[in-house]
Amino acid sequence: MAEESFYGVTLTAESDSVTWDVDEDYARGQKLVIKQILLGAEAKENEFNVVEVNTPKDSVQIPIAVLKAGETRAVNPDVEFYESKVTFKLIKGSGPVYIHGHNIKDDVEVVDMEEDDEEDDVAEDEEDEHPKKRAKIENAADGKNAKNNKKK
């Protein structure tokens, strides 16, 4: 069973960046799940507030929320960050912007998903080859029978 805890941070003009990092002392899989990003009630009217995420492990640096008082006060990105340090930064606006979600520590060891995907692809390719061969054989048999039936 996984250990789950609440994660919440506030970004403002004075404190515009926060970083979440995996617990090095925890040997099993960890992930951060961001469920919602909210614009605070004190936010200035007609000011865009843009939150950017940066994951150095995957070289990702992209805005994940654009909020504006009077228009969009909340987004539900439902994004997950596995085994990677993540930095959230308020790159435009003065906030406050609230980010919350879950920090999940698995009891099961994390397996490299890319290796599993490659193994699955190979197995699927092998399965796909056999039906195609059977179909060709069946079609060839049908074709011969059809010609023989026409000659009679």
UniProtKB/Swiss-Prot annotation:
Disulfide pairings: none
Q: Which Pfam families match?
A: Nucleoplasmin
Q: Where is the composition biased (Basic and acidic residues)?
A: 136-145
Question: In chain numbering, where does the site feature Interaction between pentamers fall?
Answer: 45, 68
Which key words are in the record? Nucleus
- Give the source's domain of life in one word: Eukaryota
Annotated segments matching region Disordered: 109-152
Question: Which residue windows does the record flag with biased composition (Acidic residues)?
Answer: 109-128
Q: What does this protein do?
A: Binds to core histones and functions in the ATP-facilitated assembly of approximately regularly spaced nucleosomal arrays. May participate in parallel with other histone-binding proteins such as NAP-1.
Assembly? Decamer formed by two pentameric rings associated in a head-to-head fashion.
Instruction: Please identify the protein, giving its name as recorded.
Output: Nucleoplasmin-like protein
